[in-house]
Amino acid sequence: MSVQSKEVTNDKGQQYHICCSKEDIGRYVLLPGDPFRTDIIARHLENAKLVAHNREHKTWTGTLNGEKVTVCSTGMGCPSTAIALEELIHCGADTFIRVGTCGRVCPESYNEDLEGVIITGAVRDEGTTVHYVPIEYPAIADRHVIDALAKACNDKGYNFAEGIAQSKDSFYGQHDPDSMPNSGRLHQRWEAWEKSRVMASEMETAALFIVSSIRGARAGAIMAYGSMNDHTIELACDAIKVLIERDKE
Ligand SMILES: O=P(O)(O)O[C@H]1O[C@H](CO)[C@@H](O)[C@H]1O
Ligand SMILES: O=c1cc[nH]c(=O)[nH]1
């Protein structure tokens, strides 16, 4: 039996950061980092309505296959992602797909034909999730969500790999480690991720997987290499439809 966090509300009784209430949020949620990306993803929903926009969290709710589906931006990094997750779970959400962008890491990921990655697990190279549970606990995706993403990808014939993401706290620690006094440690660890077949580097998935596991929710992630593309958004929406249909069975 999973335990929810205590609700913290604003003066309207809404969740403190996302400024939403239970009736605003669907069971199924798409999670981009960027608030502007929510507008693009919301166009894939039927009857999408803007519910709230507070700080980095912009939230739309509409339907897919007749079920209520929400799009909510997490902002950049694990702290704001964990906050969004907790508050969406307070509102009754239990199924999450991150729709993000990422960088390439291991040699295999540098195959230019690959559009992106369906994430199966995340390296907890960040500071948020140790506030939840010791580092030995794995950050893994829900197998039903991975399978729904894999089915969507197979049906469309798009070229996505499956693999592990590194969730880090410093974008410039990845892109310019030599400018950091801590460069030795950054290089050593990056080499370890390259040698251990890490397929993607990004900043939110570890928090998504850890908070979801601990709170008893299901989560997965699909990420585009470089900038966001239509295929990644399409597959995330298709996977939500697969889960909706399978949940009815
Ligand atoms: O495209 P999003 O979802 O923001 O994800 C990636 O892009 C940002 C860095 O540019 C980080 O948030 C990283 O995880
Ligand atoms: O290289 C990249 C691209 C997106 N997001 C990251 O964190 N790194």
List where the protein language model places each region.
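Glycine-rich phosphate/pyrophosphate-binding loops
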Residues: V99, R215-S227
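Active-site rim beta-loop-alpha module in soluble metabolic enzymes
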Residues: E136-K195
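Flexible, glycine/charged-enriched surface loops at secondary-structure junctions
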Residues: A48-H53, K156-I164, I222, L243-E249
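Metabolite-binding pocket within alpha/beta catalytic cores that recognizes anionic/polar moieties
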Residues: M1-A148
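A C-terminal functional module that forms or caps the active site or interfaces directly
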Residues: H187-G220
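Expand to "…catalyze enediolate/carbanion chemistry for C-C bond making/breaking, isomerization
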Residues: H90, N182, I214, I222, ...
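A generic structural signal for tightly packed, nonpolar segments enriched in small/aliphatic residues
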Residues: A139-I140, N154, A207, D247-E249
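His/Asp/Glu-rich mid-to-C-terminal helical/loop segments that flank catalytic regions of hydrolases
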Residues: S227-E249
